[in-house]
């Protein structure tokens, strides 16, 4: 099963991705983790990504796409994967579609974890990070909405909405149900 997880910062995507990957016996692919591992290992892509990150810039899509494409070449992804944090734009979604087409497969499901803005504010402020001010959090939510609206349209028929308010186990049960598991 090949699954894309979408949701705003604080929706619990990373936690649910781990739980789903464990339950389904497939890897969780997080672009953040891919960047960290490639930087730590000193790969060519890692060195290039580090230049952007050190400058405080976003890593260009072509570089992110290459990292994901390389990860999809690993044997553990043959039975499927959970993508967490990718794609973030229609451009990346189209690149992913092409990567999977070359492997004669496609995305099986897109789960959108939905949480109210008030709940997200509380969750993110509760993390106690110094940079998580209301202004910064609200801006991150706006950026997410602006980026994700076109993505939801792109994946239209594959998107299943998951109510992400509740305990970890309640949200997990809803996610499994949305996947028909």
Curated annotation (Swiss-Prot):
Indicate the quaternary assembly. Answer: Monomer.
List the PROSITE patterns: ADENYLATE_KINASE
Which EC numbers does the record give? 2.7.4.3
Instruction: Give positions of region: NMP.
Output: 30-59
> What molecular function terms (GO) are annotated for this protein?
adenylate kinase activity; ATP binding
Any idea which positions bind ATP? 10-15, 127, 166
CDD domains recorded = ADK (cd01428)
Give the pathway: Purine metabolism; AMP biosynthesis via salvage pathway; AMP from ADP: step 1/1
Task: Give the GO biological process terms.
Answer: AMP salvage
Q: Which reaction does it catalyse?
A: AMP + ATP = 2 ADP
Q: What is known of its domains?
A: Consists of three domains, a large central CORE domain and two small peripheral domains, NMPbind and LID, which undergo movements during catalysis. The LID domain closes over the site of phosphoryl transfer upon ATP binding. Assembling and dissambling the active center during each catalytic cycle provides an effective means to prevent ATP hydrolysis.
Compartment list: Cytoplasm
Q: What does this protein do?
A: Catalyzes the reversible transfer of the terminal phosphate group between ATP and AMP. Plays an important role in cellular energy homeostasis and in adenine nucleotide metabolism.
Q: Where does AMP bind?
A: 31, 36, 57-59, 85-88, 92, 129, 140
Return the annotated region ranges for LID.
126-132
Q: List the protein's name.
A: Adenylate kinase
The terms describing its cellular component in GO are:
cytoplasm
């Amino acid at each position: 099963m090949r699954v894309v997880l979408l949701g705003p910062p604080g929706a619990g995507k990373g936690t649910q991705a781990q739980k789903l990957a464990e339950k389904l016996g497939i890897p969780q692919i997080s672009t953040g983790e891919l960047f960290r591992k490639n930087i730590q290992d000193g790969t060519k892509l890692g060195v290039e990504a580090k230049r952007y990150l050190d400058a405080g810039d976003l890593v260009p899509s072509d570089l992110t796409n290459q990292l994901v494409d390389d990860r999809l070449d690993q044997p553990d992804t043959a039975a499927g994967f959970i993508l967490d944090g990718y794609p973030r734009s229609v451009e990346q979604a189209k690149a992913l579609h092409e990567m999977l087409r070359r492997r004669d497969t496609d995305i099986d499901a897109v789960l959108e974890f939905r949480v109210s803005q008030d709940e997200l504010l509380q969750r993110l402020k509760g993390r106690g990070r110094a940079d998580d001010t209301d202004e910064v959090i609200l801006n991150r939510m706006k950026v997410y909405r602006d980026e994700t609206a076109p993505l939801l349209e792109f994946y239209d028929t594959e998107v299943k909405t998951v109510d992400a308010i509740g305990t970890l186990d309640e949200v997990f049960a809803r996610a499994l149900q949305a996947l028909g598991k």
